[in-house]
């Protein structure tokens, strides 16, 4: 797969430790896509809803501590964001992030395939163009606080905050 030059340049700009000014990011609470039989029978589970917020907060904290990002407060758009399906709203995540003054909109979705098998996805979109800058995902096993947190840590450490992530090989 070829990556368009402008996307590659933006990825390198966003993910480069040498970037002079920290990028302003809006990290929205993660969303759950529950395609499991358990989800169809039982509906949303309180522990999973809490984990979605916990994982988003983990991402916010890691980005702020990295020093390459300014994590913006989502309070002014939280109600609208929570009322939207950010993964399929036609770019409303970018519009909300623009309202906050963000350079990058960060959304995440956890897909629950079964009671045991899940997948975490994180997406970064440029608020000027609406284009996807990068996406990362990881499958994980076990629907526990620890498995969700470890998966987010893996994506942060080995993708989003990795020094050479997105650089040509």
Q: Which role does the model predict for each range below?
A:
Residues 42, 46-50, 142, 146:
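Charge-dense, low-complexity intrinsically disordered segments
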Residues 45-76:
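N-terminal, post-signal-peptide region of Sec/Tat-exported proteins
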Residues 16, 26, 106:
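Conserved Rossmann-like nucleotide-binding pocket used by diverse enzymes
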Residues 5-15:
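Bacterial N-terminal signal peptides
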Residues 36-43, 82-83:
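Short acidic, glycine/proline-rich loop/turn micro-motifs
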């Amino acid at each position: 797969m070829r990556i368009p030059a402008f996307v590659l340049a933006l990825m390198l700009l966003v993910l480069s430790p040498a970037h002079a000014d920290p990028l302003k990011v809006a990290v929205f609470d993660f969303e759950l896509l529950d395609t499991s039989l358990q989800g169809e029978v039982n509906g949303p589970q309180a522990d999973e809803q809490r984990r979605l917020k916990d994982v988003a907060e983990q991402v916010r904290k890691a980005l702020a501590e990295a020093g390459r990002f300014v994590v913006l407060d989502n309070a002014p758009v939280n109600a609208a964001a929570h009322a939207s399906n950010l993964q399929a709203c036609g770019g409303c995540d970018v519009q909300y992030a623009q309202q906050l003054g963000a350079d990058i909109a960060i959304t995440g979705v956890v897909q629950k395939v079964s009671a045991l098998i899940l997948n975490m996805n994180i997406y970064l979109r440029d608020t000027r163009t609406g284009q996807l800058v990068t996406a990362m995902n990881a499958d994980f096993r076990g629907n526990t606080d620890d498995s969700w947190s470890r998966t987010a840590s893996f994506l942060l450490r080995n993708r989003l905050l990795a020094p050479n992530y997105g650089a040509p090989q």
